[in-house]
Regions:
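Short metal-coordination and nucleic-acid-contact micro-motifs, chiefly zinc-binding Cys/His arrays
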Residues: 4, 18, 163, 201
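The −1 position to Zn-ligating cysteines in a subset of zinc-ribbon hairpins
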Residues: 7, 14, 21, 184, ...
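Cys/His-coordinated zinc-binding microdomains
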Residues: 12, 26, 206-209
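Short functional micro-motifs and their immediate structural scaffolds
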Residues: 14-16, 30, 175, 213
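Short Cys/His-rich micro-motifs in 6-15 aa windows
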Residues: 25-32
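Fold-level signature of zinc-dependent metallopeptidase catalytic domains
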Residues: 32-46
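Metzincin-family zinc-dependent endopeptidase catalytic domain
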Residues: 44-161, 173
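Metalloprotease/metallohydrolase-associated module, dominated by Zn2+-dependent proteases
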Residues: 127-157, 173-221
Length: 221
């Protein structure tokens, strides 16, 4: 029995990951995302938040953003004894979809969820998670929604984290806070919090932007 299906938002049925249409109701599940940022959802995500994040990412990277109609199967990432879903399992689900079927040619694959995600049982929360130099990353709205921000504020937070994680996909590492660089890649896992996130920027510094531009140029060639 397959345990990582795509879930139809229309009828709730599961279908194979490479199925374009729902096996039960024929609703679309996977759209062509070649040359785009593909967005996958683990559970339902507020449409107005999702739309705002997609707009900011598209503007930052100069790429179209395709929100896939299907939801990710929640079973692989469930960890009943943890404080959230497994960030690694969630990321692996997104990564598996990046290179198969309609996902072939996707520039980056981004997972978004309203659930809390953690990399292990000792963790309380994450903002995002990524593979360095690989084309997949995930973002959670859970912690950044904890102080009931406005829609605009939440979208900015989430888009900032998404752009940061895509920076890791491009091979970028962190700047330290002590460097005083205004860049979306400024971070420290021991210091990161909502206050730090709100003080930062969603833009790359000049040096990081050059790396991202070279990466995108290579992918387009």
């Amino acid at each position: 029995m397959q345990t990582d299906t795509n879930i139809c938002l229309n009828c709730g049925a599961g279908s194979a990951r490479d199925a374009r249409l729902c096996a039960n109701c024929a609703a679309p599940l996977v759209l062509d995302s070649k040359g785009s940022v593909a967005v996958w959802r683990l559970g339902e995500v507020r449409p107005e938040v999702l739309d705002g994040i997609a707009r900011m990412i598209g503007k930052s990277l100069g790429l179209p953003v395709v929100v896939q109609p299907a939801l990710l199967d929640p079973r692989p990432s469930r960890r009943p004894d943890w404080r959230g879903a497994s960030a690694t399992a969630f990321l692996n689900q997104v990564d598996r979809r990046a290179g198969s079927g309609k996902g072939r040619g996707t520039v980056f694959s981004l997972g978004i969820t309203e659930e809390n995600i953690v990399p292990g049982s000792a963790w309380n929360y994450l903002f995002g998670y990524a593979y360095l130099g690989q084309p997949s990353c995930v973002v959670t709205l859970h912690q950044m929604s904890s102080d009931s921000p406005s829609l605009r504020h939440l979208v900015r937070r989430a888009a900032t984290i998404a752009i940061h994680e895509i920076g890791h996909n491009c091979g970028l590492d962190h700047h330290g806070y002590d460097e005083g660089i205004a860049c979306v890649m400024t971070a420290d896992t021991e210091l990161d919090c909502l206050e730090r996130l709100d003080e930062g920027t969603h833009r790359f510094c000049r040096a990081c932007q050059l790396v991202v531009d070279r990466k995108l140029a290579g992918l387009r060639s």
